[in-house]
Design a protein with these regions (language model features):
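Active-site neighborhood of phospho(di)ester-bond hydrolases with catalytic His/Asp-centered motifs
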Residues: 1, 28-34, 56-59, 102-106, ...
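Mobile, glycine- and charge-enriched loop segments
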Residues: 1-10, 52-54, 72, 93-99
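Charged catalytic cores and adjacent phosphate/nucleic-acid-binding surfaces used
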Residues: 2, 7, 19, 41-44, ...
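Mid-domain alpha/beta scaffold segments of enzyme catalytic cores
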Residues: 15-16, 20-23, 27, 35-65
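A short helix->loop->beta-strand "cap" motif at the edges of active sites that frequently abuts
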Residues: 26, 53, 98, 161-164
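Active-site-adjacent beta->alpha loops and helix N-cap segments on the catalytic face
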Residues: 36-43, 83-95, 145-149
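Binuclear metal-dependent hydrolase catalytic cores centered on His/Asp/Glu-rich metal-binding motifs
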Residues: 69-101
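Internal, conserved structured core segments that host functional sites
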Residues: 94-107, 115-122
Length: 199
């Protein structure tokens, strides 16, 4: 989820997202602001104001190759330059002293092609976003009770070929999309922090 606090493309405030998440039955949310991870003190304040919701912070990194990779790791208030090369991102991540989880977000949002740059990314991330509000925008069809991207096959083929963990995300930038699409995970207890979530 993106907030107006850190992502210029969002019109949703952090507190409003938290309120809506609880109203819509979510147990947890992950803020994935563009290029920056929430500062620990600010995230702590938001968590304190919303004890009924588990709040995590990752970062969505826009790459020079034209794709976006989300990083979930121990909160270290990360900041990455816009259009960093994927190889440089991996180098930066190698300096982290803790595990991290990466996934490519909406890789086929504009086309179904798989150029060599995308193949390289797919071969080195842990997961792939198969559906989100922004993937569906202007290119969806309904199959039974689900809305799917028109190019669902491209997403599923990449996920299967590379053995990637499938993710279904709101990718919320506005109130209406909070919880519209969500991951359902069968955990006995929610991870206490980003480090456990990444594992």
């Amino acid at each position: 989820m993106h907030t107006s606090r850190y992502s210029a493309c969002s019109i949703a405030t952090p507190q409003r997202i938290c309120e809506l998440a609880v109203q819509r039955g979510l147990d947890a949310i992950v803020f994935t602001e563009h290029q920056v991870q929430w500062l620990k003190p600010e995230l702590g304040q938001l968590r304190g104001a919303n004890p009924e919701l588990r709040i995590y912070s990752g970062v969505e990194v826009s790459l020079a190759e034209g794709y976006d990779v989300v990083v979930i790791c121990e909160n270290q208030s990360l900041h990455f330059p816009f259009a960093i090369k994927f190889k440089e991102l991996l180098e930066e991540l190698s300096y982290l002293r803790s595990p991290y989880f990466t996934f490519v977000a909406h890789p086929f949002r504009y086309h179904s092609a798989r150029p060599s740059e995308l193949e390289m990314i797919l071969s080195q991330v842990d997961g792939i976003e198969l559906n989100s509000v922004n993937i569906l925008r202007g290119q969806a069809h309904k199959k039974k009770d689900k809305f799917l991207p028109l190019n669902t096959r491209a997403y599923l083929q990449a996920q299967e070929e590379y053995g990637l963990i499938p993710l279904f995300n709101s990718d919320a930038h506005a109130d209406y999309s909070v919880g519209a699409i969500a991951n359902f995970v069968d955990w006995s207890a929610l991870p206490k922090d980003e480090l456990q979530l990444a594992k």
